[in-house]
Every structure is written in structure tokens, then in C-alpha cells.
């Protein structure tokens, strides 16, 4: 674990916006070999894992990180108290099917199984066959917290996720390979 200070996962800036402020360093990205993540646009964001304050498994939305009205759900009863409607329905199923882990993860909810096409937000995702699992999650962030979840530090999720009988994990990988040494060498 790095001792370098980390930022909380409140909002991710779009790199292309830096061009508007005169910072052209983002253009070097186009010629730098490496690994990048692909953002999946699901809803709501689901946070799950072991609460370091209680040692118990929990599920929730980003409200688990709230400073004041914290909504951490260690049971179906707590989900019923803290949430309603579609979000409560999703959290109940996530509580039943997401893997128990000592870590804390965040991912976008894509949908319930049984279809081959999903539009959780604006983007439609097509699977080659009907999804047989109960839920589809796109994990993207892991957190480290010693005590309270509101003090958790976000890190990109580098874990390899394998589907289970109940959960389909969506985590596309993308790689960039270029022959140029700098943006100015691009023809």
C-alpha cells in the first residue's frame, strides 16, 4: 500500500477538459503505451464489502461515505429503513448475491440477469448471450479504510473479477500500443 496521500472518490475530472485551461499534457496520453480503464455507465453505484468499524458485510450506495446522513446497510432491515423503491430493490438483491470480501469495492449496477441487452443509464450494453446470473456489476474502485467508511481512500480497482453463479462482473480491459515517442511524432 502506498503511503502517498490519496484523494477521495468524489468526482473524476475528464482529462480532455485540461486542454481548455491550456494544459496540453493530456495529448501525450495518445502516444504513451500503457493500460487504461474503461468506465461503464451503470446506476446506481453500489458499494460493498466489510465495514472496518463493525467487521460486518454491508452494501450501500455512495451514501455510505456521507459525513452526516450515513446509510450503511448490514442487513435487509437496514436497507428497508435507509432506502426505498428501485434502489432498495437493487440493494436487497446485491446484499444476497455480492461476494463477501474483507475489502471494500464500488461498482456500477448494470441490471438484473435474464436479458442480453441493458441500458442502466444512457449507454446500452449488449452481451453475446442472455445473462444467466442474478445481477450484473461493473466494479471499478476499491477503498482502504481503517475505521469509518467516510474516511475511506479510493484507489483504482486492479482486481481480476470472475463471474459467479449469481453475479456477472463486467470489467473491460483496454490497452494502448503506439510507435511514436511523443505527440509531435504522430503523422
Give the residues covered by each predicted segment.
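Active-site-proximal "nucleotidyltransferase
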Residues: 1-44, 52, 56-118
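Short helix/loop capping segments that flank catalytic or ligand/cofactor-binding pockets
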Residues: 47-49, 68-69, 147-150
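Beta-strand-enriched accessory nucleic-acid recognition/scaffold domains that flank the catalytic cores
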Residues: 179-187
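Short acidic-glycine loop/turn motifs at beta-strand connectors
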Residues: 49-55, 132, 143
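Internal, well-ordered alpha/beta segment that forms a basic, Gly-enriched binding/recognition surface
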Residues: 81-179
